Amino acid sequence: MPKISVIGAGNVGATLAQRLIEKDFADVVMLDVVEGIPQGKALDISQSASVLGFRHTITGSNDYAQTAGSEIVVITAGIARKPGMTREELLAINQKIMTDVVSNCLKYSPEATLVVVSNPVDTMTYLAWKLSGLPRKRVVGLSGVLDGGRLATFVARELGVNPSAVSPCVMGEHGGSMVVMSRFTLVNGKPLSELVSPEKADELAKRAVNGGAEIVAFLKTGSAFYAPSASVAAMVEAIFLGSGKVMNCAAVLDGEYGLRNIVLGVPVKLGKGGIKEIITLPLDGQENARLQASAEMVKVQIASLSL
């Protein structure tokens, strides 16, 4: 049976594992270092099989050997962002976690595609790529799928349309410098830039940029996990099924948009093995300047890694 492993059984990891097993295209292994947590959550999820009708199995474990032969490994492990904590402050702790996770995952699944969710995700995706030694196409991070989902929600509310009518385009860092591309964000096929004023577009963009922090402020003791897990599940499905679907993801760039040796959110075509193609949009001068500025923010984080 094909297998997908989820590393980390916190809110994002466990909800993702649930979403994946309900899609019923592969067995799911949920791994965590805390004994009992992945086992208990997996058992709970498995007891919904007769209700929902999925046939594949979900297993919880503390042993990386259980992940052997995974086609895709999703890395959610890391500490959650707390109120007032920046993504950069997560870096030192999550770098140590990522180093251990990548080593163990590839020991048992050397052919796996890595999907990185841990924050700060652009930098963690870069770190996973460097640690793994894998081709850049086999390492991808959560970015614009989530940010775009947030944007689509606010655009839909503003214009009174269904969120599914919005095709968002959010590029750059998954963080404060992310860039909403209004010309390439479509609402029923029409550019957002033609439907709202520049001021309104900026207002919607700021709401999307602050979407994660807004949730953290409400929750007090945690961060978002429903929309993030849904976003990652969509990415995993596109990779596993080889759909060729275009999504905005954190990808290793090698000349695209004039950038090299960096991970940044850009449109990519996902399929078997990870990224099949990086889509280069015809950005105008202002759009490109904003993307380059966002890249500079990520470069600062990457430079602080201990490699």
Swiss-Prot record:
InterPro entries: L-lactate/malate_DH, Lactate/malate_DH_C, Lactate/malate_DH_N, Lactate_DH/Glyco_Ohase_4_C, Malate_DH_type3, NAD(P)-bd_dom_sf. CDD domains: LDH-like_MDH. This is Malate dehydrogenase. It comes from Dehalococcoides mccartyi (strain CBDB1). PANTHER family: L-2-HYDROXYCARBOXYLATE DEHYDROGENASE (NAD(P)(+)) (PTHR43128), L-LACTATE DEHYDROGENASE (PTHR43128:SF16). Its EC number is 1.1.1.37. Substrate binds at residues 81, 87, 119, 150. One of its GO terms (molecular function) is L-malate dehydrogenase (NAD+) activity. SUPFAM superfamilies: LDH C-terminal domain-like, NAD(P)-binding Rossmann-fold domains. It catalyses: (S)-malate + NAD(+) = oxaloacetate + NADH + H(+). Belongs to the LDH/MDH superfamily. MDH type 3 family. It comes from the Bacteria. Keywords: NAD, Oxidoreductase, Tricarboxylic acid cycle. Signal peptide: none annotated. NAD(+) binds at residues 8-13, 32, 94, 117-119. The keyword Ligase does not apply.
